[in-house]
C-alpha cells in the first residue's frame, strides 16, 4: 500500500518550513563532541545555549535537544520499531494516509502499522548527511543521568573523530536503521558522523542518581569545566528572603551563597557548592522552595555523606525544618546583622 499524494505533499510542505539553511564552516578547533560540567546552578544550560547561538545561529531546524534520564534507552535515542496509526478510506479504495496527516480524519478507518520511528540521533544524522554545508547540533542535557554507554550502543565507535571532525571508523547499523536511512536518501553501506554533526552535552556530577561515565566513553569527548562564579554578575541584584532566628530577613543572594560556600570549601567537592542559578529569581522569596530545595540539598546531598562537618544545627531534615519555622538558628554559626538588607 502506498502513502497518498496528499500526505506526501503535506510532508513536503513541512520540510520546506525549515527555511533557508545557513551555509558556513566551523573552525576545526571547535570540538564536535563536547561536555560542559560544573556545580549545580552554575548556568551550564545557559552557557551552552549562548555558545550554540553564536556558532549555529537561530534557525531551530539546525539544533535538536534531548534530556537523558534514568531508564532512557538506545531505542529512544537512536530509534526503534513502534506501532504507528494509519488511516484507510472507508470507500474501499486502497489509499492509505499516515498519522502525520493533520486534517480532520472523517470517513477513514484507523489501522495500526509497525514502522521504524527514528530517535533524535538518527533525525540529526540524516539532516547532517543531506546538508553537508550546514552545521547541525544535538544537545544532550544531563548526559550522565542515563547509562550513556548503553544509550549510545553501537554508535559509541562513531564518536572517535579525525582532525577534520569526521568519524575515524564507520559502522553498519542493523537492517531496520539502514533501511530507514536508505528510504531517506542515505544509501551508504557504512555510516560515519560527518564533520557538520556536533554533539554537545551538559553534566552534573553533584546530584544523586547520576551514573559515572567510563574512561573509554569520556576519552571521546572534550570536557569543559564551567567555573562556579562565571555568571555571578548576572544575579548581583537578586535578594533572598529567609527566616533567621524567628525573624523574616532579606539578604543578597550572592552574599548568602558566599557565606555557605566559604564554609564548605575544602570540606566538600567543589561541585557541591551553590552556583548563581541554584535557585531561580522567582524562587528566592518562596519559603517552601527554600526549605524543600536548598535546605534539602544541603542536608541530603551535601552533608549526608559528610556528617562530621559542623554546619547545620539539626540531625534530621524534619528537625531542620522545625527549627527553621521556629525561632532557632539552623546554622552552627551566626550570620552577621550587617549582611541583611531591606527588601
Curated annotation (Swiss-Prot):
Reactions catalysed, as given in the entry: Endonucleolytic cleavage of DNA to give specific double-stranded fragments with terminal 5'-phosphates
Function: A P subtype restriction enzyme that recognizes the double-stranded sequence 5'-CTCGAG-3'; the cleavage site is unknown.
Classification lineage: Bacteria, Bacillati, Bacillota, Bacilli, Bacillales
Induction of its expression: Constitutively expressed during exponential growth. Encoded in an operon with ydiR and ydjA.
Summary of subunit composition and partner proteins: BsuMI restriction activity requires YdiR, YdiS and YdjA.
Gene label: ydiS
Keywords on record: Endonuclease, Hydrolase, Nuclease, Restriction system
A matching Pfam family: AAA_5
GO BP: any one term: DNA restriction-modification system
GO molecular function per UniProt: ATP binding; ATP hydrolysis activity; type II site-specific deoxyribonuclease activity
Enzyme Commission number(s) from the entry: 3.1.21.4
Effect of disrupting the coding gene: Not essential; its disruption results in increased transformation by plasmid DNA carrying multiple BsuMI target sequences. Triple deletion ydiO-ydiP-ydiS leads to loss of susceptibility to MspJI, which only digests C-methylated DNA.
Protein name as catalogued: Type II restriction enzyme BsuMI component YdiS
Amino acid at each position: 500500500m502506498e502513502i497518498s499524494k496528499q500526505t506526501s505533499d503535506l510532508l513536503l510542505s513541512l520540510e520546506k518550513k525549515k527555511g533557508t539553511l545557513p551555509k558556513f564552516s566551523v573552525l576545526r578547533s571547535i570540538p564536535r563532541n563536547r561536555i560542559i560540567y560544573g556545580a549545580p546552578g552554575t548556568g551550564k544550560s545557559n552557557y551552552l545555549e549562548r555558545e550554540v547561538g553564536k556558532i549555529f545561529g537561530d534557525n531551530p531546524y539546525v539544533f535538536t535537544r534531548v534530556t537523558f534520564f534514568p531508564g532512557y534507552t538506545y531505542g529512544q535515542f537512536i530509534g526503534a520499531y513502534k506501532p504507528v496509526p494509519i488511516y484507510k478510506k472507508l470507500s474501499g479504495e486502497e489509499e492509505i494516509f499516515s498519522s502525520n496527516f493533520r486534517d480532520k480524519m472523517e470517513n477513514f478507518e484507523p489501522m495500526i502499522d509497525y514502522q521504524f520511528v527514528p530517535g533524535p540521533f538518527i533525525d540529526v544524522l540524516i539532516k547532517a548527511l543531506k546538508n553537508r554545508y550546514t552545521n547541525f547540533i544535538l544537545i544532550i542535557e544531563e548526559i550522565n543521568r542515563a547509562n550513556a554507554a548503553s544509550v549510545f550502543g553501537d554508535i559509541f565507535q562513531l564518536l572517535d573523530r579525525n582532525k577534520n571532525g569526521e568519524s575515524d571508523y564507520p559502522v553498519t547499523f542493523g537492517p531496520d536503521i539502514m533501511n530507514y536511512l536508505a528510504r531517506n536518501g542515505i544509501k551508504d553501506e557504512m555510516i560515519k558522523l560527518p564533520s557538520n554533526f556536533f554533539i554537545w552535552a551538559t553534566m552534573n556530577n553533584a546530584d544523586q542518581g547520576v551514573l559515572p561515565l567510563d574512561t573509554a566513553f569520556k576519552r571521546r569527548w572534550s570536557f569543559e569545566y564551567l567555573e562556579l562564579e562565571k555568571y555571578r554578575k548576572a544575579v548581583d541584584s537578586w535578594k533572598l528572603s529567609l527566616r533567621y532566628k524567628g525573624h523574616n530577613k532579606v539578604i543578597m543572594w550572592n552574599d548568602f551563597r558566599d557565606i555557605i560556600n566559604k564554609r564548605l570549601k575544602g570540606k566538600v567537592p567543589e561541585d557541591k557548592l551553590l552556583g548563581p542559578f541554584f535557585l531561580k529569581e522567582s524562587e528566592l522569596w518562596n519559603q517552601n522552595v527554600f526549605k524543600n530545595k536548598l535546605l534539602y540539598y544541603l542536608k541530603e546531598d551535601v552533608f549526608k555523606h559528610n556528617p562530621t562537618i559542623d554546619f547545620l544545627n539539626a540531625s534530621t531534615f524534619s528537625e531542620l525544618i522545625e527549627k527553621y519555622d521556629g525561632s532557632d538558628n539552623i546554622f552552627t554559626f551566626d550570620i552577621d546583622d550587617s549582611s541583611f538588607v531591606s527588601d
